Amino acid sequence: MTAENEDDSLYAKTVKRTFYNEDGEICFEQIGDNCFLCNGKMLNQYDLLDLFFDSLDLNDKDVLLLDRAYDLKFNDVIFEKRLLCKKFCVIHSGHYFEDGQSESSIYLNFEYYYWFKYSKYIDSFIVSTENQKINLINVLSDYKYDIPKIKVIPVGAVESLCISNGRKPNSIITASRLVNEKRIDLVIRAVIEAHNSNNQITLDIYGKGDKPVEDKLRKIVKENNAESYIRFTGHQSLENVYQNYDLYISMSMFETFGLTLLEAAASGCALIGLDVPYGNATFIKEGYNGCLIDHSYNQSKDSVIELEKLVAERILKILSNKDILNKFSNNSYELANNFLLYKIEEKWKEILY
């Protein structure tokens, strides 16, 4: 049935669900959110999960992959049962946020609190970058938690490198959700500043998101008479798109991995980004395939303006020198080669078999 949240938004509320086996027989029924009828017994969600894990009969040769730690009911059952199987916990997002790094979290990420508290029962954490591994070890140590093995297996990969048949000169691309923390406004203002010195520069913005944020970004473009060289292209497949551009820019405040950074590097784009955790420093190497710019999360209005000018300077430096541009492009391909799908598959095989 349709129900209302406290903020008056609507959601689908569970009234009753019936689950069948392959023979069309009823296995169990769900009444509301936390009541289940199974073989004539009334169970809550914990009881049902407990029954499920008993039926699996896991042993020390089995592997249990845990993802999205915020579902505490799964965690309760898994750790209280002291299952014999190996337990690998995949950390997809940031585990710790300094003041200003995230709009929704500060310090230890509540999503992973349970895992960290019971880390002595975990065989391995899996993170996407070496930088996050180092930081996670430090955070667990600071909070006096046990430190299990920590494996680095990137959450993203590319099947192949995308070789360009020709890039539009002076072209820039950025791609992300249009939300505040991606700081597309910085990208736009930096491009406007750079365009004052090189009127051949163009920027295409791929992605959709919060309408108020998009409206604000479009207003910046319009107020600066930049509609002729800054375009909003919406959400679309970026396959065979990156390689048409010279330069990819990300001003995101935090990237646990940064799949678009990898895709841009795999397409031979030069890269510009802020030196923030963790993906930017993984895919952008200062002077090698782009520019990694120092950043402070507690910035004054004047320092933001200086940052915009600094990014504009880096844009002009890269696009005005074909030798630098070619060097950065070749090195991006070289860096992305480490993230080919078959190489990531080998990393999984190492821990699973």
Regions found by a protein language model. Name each.
Residues 112-113, 118-147:
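A short, active-site helix/loop in glycosyltransferases that binds the activated sugar's phosphate group
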